[in-house]
């Protein structure tokens, strides 16, 4: 019988493989979701460094949100990461959802980043 941990690992491997196939030297917008917060980073895999990041732990964002773990918070982080990425000169990224299903907070972050001007 396949455990849920195995299913999650397979999903993550499948997503990473597809990202490598379509990346074409574009930076990767990586999302990490915890029970309390949500984090986003734009990572340049060629240089091996993080270009910009945003999370609900940042003080200015934390003050304006009632919770760091809802869709509203994810939307705010998506807007912020798009703004910072555009300021750093990044317009096109590859969305890396990891093993998370494209639904709820992950989807809200992605849609906000698209509204903010990132294309993926």
Swiss-Prot record:
Q: Name one GO molecular function term.
A: structural constituent of ribosome
Provide the GO biological process annotations.
Answer: translation
Q: What is this protein called?
A: Large ribosomal subunit protein uL18
HAMAP family xref list = Ribosomal_uL18_B
Cysteine pairs bridged by disulfides in the record: none
Does this entry carry the keyword rRNA-binding?
yes
Give the family this protein belongs to, as stated in its UniProt record: Belongs to the universal ribosomal protein uL18 family.
- Per the UniProt entry, what species is this protein from, by scientific name? Bartonella tribocorum (strain CIP 105476 / IBS 506)
Q: What does this protein do?
A: This is one of the proteins that bind and probably mediate the attachment of the 5S RNA into the large ribosomal subunit, where it forms part of the central protuberance.
Lineage at the top is:
Bacteria, Pseudomonadati, Pseudomonadota, Alphaproteobacteria, Hyphomicrobiales
Q: Which InterPro entries match?
A: Ribosomal_uL18_bac-type, Ribosomal_uL18_bac/euk
Name the Pfam families for this protein.
Ribosomal_L18p
């Amino acid at each position: 019988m396949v455990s849920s941990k195995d299913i999650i690992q397979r999903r993550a491997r499948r997503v990473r493989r597809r990202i490598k196939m379509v990346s074409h030297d574009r930076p990767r917008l990586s999302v990490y979701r915890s029970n309390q917060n949500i984090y986003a980073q734009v990572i340049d895999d060629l240089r091996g460094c993080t270009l910009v990041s945003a999370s609900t732990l940042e003080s200015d964002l934390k003050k304006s949100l009632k919770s760091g773990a809802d869709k509203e918070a994810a939307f705010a982080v998506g807007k912020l990461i798009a703004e910072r990425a555009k300021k750093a000169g990044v317009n096109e990224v590859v969305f890396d959802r990891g093993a998370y299903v494209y639904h709820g907070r992950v989807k809200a972050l992605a849609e906000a980043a698209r509204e903010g001007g990132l294309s993926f």
